[in-house]
Amino acid sequence: MKRLAGFFLVAVMGLSLAACETSEKIYDVISDPGIQVGADEVQPTKVSLQAYAAADVNKNFEGEASPVVVRVLALSSDHRVFSYDYFSLTDSMEKTLGSTLKADLGETMIKPDTYQVLGPYELPEGTKKIAVIAEYLDLEKAVWRTSVNVRDIGDNDQFLLLLLDEEVRLVKQEG
């Protein structure tokens, strides 16, 4: 009987200590919602874009460089981005992209010969692609859209976004 009582006492003390530790963690998360809960591998992917606009980007009719407005999108698939024209995408983005649009991550104007960091963006669940749409003045000649593959969970990705004369490029930075 003494053994059973001793075992019971040890079990109750162990549960009490575990409850205290759990309560402390819950308090920490409530007091600071930015605290990570869970391992890195199960956290949403974060993506940053280091954007550089070339000195000769987006030349106007007088040959002078002009700012470029870029929009960053989180997508489950990029097939619709490459199927529609610029104005169909930008004028009614949610309707045109439908369920493939996981999130519109934002729009930014980038001036010629400048560097700017976009993000970090936390990707929503189901994101398979990051796409960039760039508003070049001559949309007929320019390569104004690009995309790259991403995972929606467990990564912290850095991309180089190059805004060249008449072309937008998105390149994953390794390392």
Each PLM stretch: what is its role?
Residues T127-D138:
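A short, solvent-exposed beta-strand micro-motif common in secreted/extracellular proteins
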Residues Y115-E122:
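Exposed aromatic-hydrophobic patches
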Residues M1-F8:
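Bacterial N-terminal signal peptides that target proteins for export
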Residues D91-D104:
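Short beta-strand and strand-turn-strand segments in soluble, beta-rich domains
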Residues G14-D40:
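Bacterial Sec signal peptide processing site at the extreme N-terminus
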Residues E62-R71:
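Short coil-to-beta strand junction motifs in C2/discoidin
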